Amino acid sequence: MQLGKELCNYGTVLYMSYEEKINQSFQRRMGYLKMNEVQGKFRVVTEGSLEEVIARLKKPKSPKFIIIDSFQVAGWDYPQAVELMETFPKKCFIWISQEKKSQPMGGGAVRLKYICDMKIRVVGYKAYCQGRAIGDPGSYYVVWEDGIIQTSNNLPK
């Protein structure tokens, strides 16, 4: 969601919250990230078939950035995801995936990972770039400073 807010500086964002819907933690995150600051540029949907998504994206002034949370819960398979991206080559698709043993869960998600230009893995509130355009090896973006402190072994006494 934090990335979605930043992307609002460059165009409209469609956040497809299939996994969380708009549950309490989603609403809390909307609050502490001050998503009201990008009201109108950050749109959230909680359901919709692939056909409905395609129809939405064909409309004039449709979102430039599409965040799908998550690939597994969306219920699409790999060929459908590829078709969606090929149908709208000027749009940016961001796929969120569930993990199993530090890898995207399911064969379709693993295949999708390898055709994406940029892969970002978030571990312990740190986002590591694993894509084709990585910066310094081992560098990361801090997603939530307090979360890093709370999950580290160096807790204040």
Where are the regions a protein language model picked out?
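Helical mechanochemical/support elements of P-loop NTPase systems and associated helical scaffolds
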Residues: 22, 49, 77-80, 84, ...
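Conserved P-loop
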Residues: 1-51
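Short, ordered loop/turn segments at secondary-structure junctions
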Residues: 18-20, 71-72, 98-99
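Phosphate-binding/switch loop-helix module in NTP-utilizing enzymes
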Residues: 44-96
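Conserved catalytic network of the ASCE P-loop NTPase/AAA+ motor domain
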Residues: 6-9, 37, 58-61, 85-89, ...
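Short, well-ordered secondary-structure micro-motifs
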Residues: 26-29, 54-57, 78-79, 105-107
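Phosphate-binding/switch region of NTP-binding enzymes
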Residues: 86-157
